[in-house]
Amino acid sequence: MNRGLSKLHPYPFERMERLKASTRPPSTKGPIDLGIGEPQEAPPEIITRTLQEQLHQVTRYAATRGTEALRAAIARWLSRRYTLPAEAIDPDYHVLPVAGTREALFAVAQTVIGRGRPCVAMPNPFYQIYEGAALLSGAQPVYLPVHPATGLPDLAEIDEATWQRVQLLYINSPANPTGAAADLAYYRRLLALSDRHGFIIAADECYAEIYHDEAKPPPGLLAACHAEGRSDFHRCLVFHSLSKRSSVPGLRSGFVAGDPGLIHAFLRYRTYQGCALPLHVQQASTAAWSDEDHVIEARARYRERFNQVCARLADVLEEVAPPAATFYLWPRTPIDDQTFAQRLWEEENVTVLPGSFLSRAQGDGHDPGHGRVRIALVPELATCLEAAERIRRFVQRHF
């Protein structure tokens, strides 16, 4: 039995169900779930149409490395999105389609972690797959608490001796749950640390297309590499998904791009362990990465939700403002976050996720998720506004 299994924590949504188990919400109020970051947008017509047209391809096996057309569409998208030269991304060497970033983020640790006393560094709070990947690869998780001023991991929290043991660092920008986005200067510091200590950077950029200011798309790790003249993307991998960008979390389609040596090793690993994308999914993904209209329209709807919800909550909860990116609010709570979430559900039938379900206590006892909740503005506007009114009434009634 893998020893790491006994170290895994219950998943946040399992913990949320346990939190709810002892109480019942009012039957007079319909349930509103703002706890799970699952887009509620209708799937883009370009995707559903292509899936229907290509469904006959289910009779064929697909190659793990993906079709040439899909890899080329991904390479073109990366060049457009991050203003890279057309030749910067070679679809044959820099790109690997994957069945969603969840499995890829987990599998990359199994691919690159070696023997010895390895560490895997990650933000705190964090997407729980990072920790599971570290533990099940035999590594020690090292938690980088997000800095209150930036919402990004504080790189000064790890001493030099620990950095020397780090073999893989997960960075999430735009960040779940804080909504912060790293700038090029932050990426430069990461690259310098990687050069000094030799660890691989796995940049989870699945929220890269859900940003607030249409004129300021967040930069990414490959763009930072290009700005530094690192055309080989050495020790750098980025992970992207259609789940958030195109509102198709059930499609399970994404990609990994970057260092060709790492891509080659990852392809070898996934040839044995991974699941190749079905051909009809690859065709739909090719269409999705080639279209920007549906993404721009979705961003406008998210922007409207944030503007209106924040206007209703900013005077009753601390730190409520439209984030740089993602579809999350990360406000402070006037009481313990788990108690807040439980009572809100019990009284208003609104589900939000306690911040401490996404974080771990640091060595000094400080838990950067404690006293906050994550609010996912994924339902339609009217539902988000109804939820905001219920949250507002709840806070005003008690605090």
Give the ranges of each region predicted by the language model.
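N-terminal small-domain helix-loop-helix segment of the aminotransferase-like
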Residues: 2-100, 107, 288-289, 397-399
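Generic structural signal for small/hydrophobic residues in well-ordered secondary structure
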Residues: 16, 34, 51, 74, ...
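Helix C-cap/helix->beta junction micro-motif
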Residues: 23, 137, 196-197, 348, ...
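Conserved core of the PLP fold type I
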Residues: 59-192, 209-210, 214-230
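PLP-dependent enzyme catalytic core of the Aspartate aminotransferase-like
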Residues: 84, 231, 343-351, 358-399
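Conserved core segment of the aminotransferase class I/II
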Residues: 223-303, 307-310, 394-395
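Conserved glycine-rich beta-strand-loop-beta hairpin in the small C-terminal domain of fold type I
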Residues: 282, 286, 302-310, 319-333, ...
